[in-house]
Amino acid sequence: MRLTLPDFFAELDGFTERIPLDFLTHRLTKLEVSLDEFRQYLQFGANTYRRNLIHEGLCYQALVLCWRSGQRSPIHDHRGSTCGVRVLSGVAIETLFDQTEGGWIYATGSHALGENQVCGSQDSDIHQVSNLRPRGENLVSLHIYSPALLVMGTYSLTDVTRGEFTDPIYAFADGAGI
């Protein structure tokens, strides 16, 4: 059976608490969408990626993230939130990190996610998402956070201090978005 974006959101709206990661990534894999369905939300930031809110339910937020070449997220965790990501257009590079007993982080690997590929993370998983494609090759990804990810723990390769990052979310007016 075809899983449309409205059907997907209706499924997520049925949850009254945090959505399990395996459910989220499985349903993102089954989702049948095209980039055209998200055109009104494709807003890019000049200096950093941009998080565009497209839908909000009781226990989740759905955002379209728009990345220009060279833009990347901070190295971060998901602090009490589950995150499922589906690449809508372009290629995302996800770099995974682990932490030593002393608090230092180190990369354990990177992998490319092409169009329609899905990944997921939650809680203390540490990662970074990047668009490392040549200039002019944008990345667009759909992110579902359950519950909403409003503050991330951030990490540095040169310091053991865990920071906090509040990533702005852009909502839409005039009938678009929520």
PLM feature segments, named:
Residues 63-78, 122-124:
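Conserved short histidine dyad/triad with adjacent acidic residue
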Residues 1-36:
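N-terminal leader/capping segments at the start of a protein or of a new domain
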Residues 74-76, 94-95, 121, 127-134:
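Short beta-strand His + acidic residue motifs that chelate non-heme Fe in jelly-roll/DSBH
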Residues 40-71:
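A short glycine-rich, His/Asp/Glu-containing loop-to-beta-strand
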Residues 161-178:
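Long hydrophobic alpha-helical segments typical of transmembrane helices together
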Residues 69, 80-100:
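Glycine- and acidic-residue-biased ligand/ion/polar-headgroup-sensing regions
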Residues 84, 99-127, 166-170:
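Short acidic-glycine-tyrosine-enriched beta hairpin
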Residues 84, 135-151:
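A short hydrophobic beta-strand segment most commonly corresponding to one strand
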